[in-house]
């Protein structure tokens, strides 16, 4: 029995999103960092990434984000469906995304990671943008406390 919740309760957390796409050889799933801005989910990609290539061929996709805290008994499931677009990199948005996951103090970010992996100013960087056509939420935070919900407290 679905128990809805406000999607922002999950979207505001630095969690991993799972991006599901379809290719010629079947479905694929990729864990991605994300940021919610302008009523859209923005996920990292690059011009050479397979997720970007699959979405350019078929933009239909699904995204699942789960907030799970076993000890606290929290299990929140957020799902989006829709058609994604591939957008050019926007360095200020990328910095905001990095601040979500690495903290607001850029001087504390791992310089090797920023240069070699994040490559903020790389012209090959892309955003995968999903404006959800459908949204599903389910608060299953009763597996330890049921039938009462462990969240919200």
Could you tell me what each predicted segment is?
Residues 1-17, 149:
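Extreme N-terminal tail/first-helix region
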Residues 7-8, 52, 118:
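Short amphipathic alpha-helical segments and helix-helix/interface helices
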Residues 51-58, 62-88:
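Helix-adjacent hinge/juxtasegments
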Residues 47-48, 62-67, 107-116:
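Short acidic (Asp/Glu) patches
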């Amino acid at each position: 029995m679905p128990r809805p919740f406000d999607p922002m309760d999950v979207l505001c957390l630095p969690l991993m999103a799972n991006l599901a796409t379809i290719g010629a050889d079947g479905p694929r799933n990729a864990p991605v960092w994300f940021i919610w801005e302008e009523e859209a989910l923005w996920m990292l990609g690059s011009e050479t990434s397979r997720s970007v290539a699959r979405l350019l061929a078929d933009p239909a996709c699904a995204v699942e984000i789960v907030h799970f805290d076993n000890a606290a008994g929290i299990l929140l499931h957020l799902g989006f469906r829709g058609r994604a677009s591939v957008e050019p990199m926007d360095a200020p948005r990328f910095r905001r995304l990095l601040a979500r996951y690495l903290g607001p103090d850029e001087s504390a970010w791992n310089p090797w990671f920023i240069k070699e992996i994040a490559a903020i100013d790389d012209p090959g960087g892309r955003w995968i943008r999903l404006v959800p056509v459908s949204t599903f939420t389910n608060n299953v935070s009763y597996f330890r406390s049921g039938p009462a919900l462990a969240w919200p407290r």
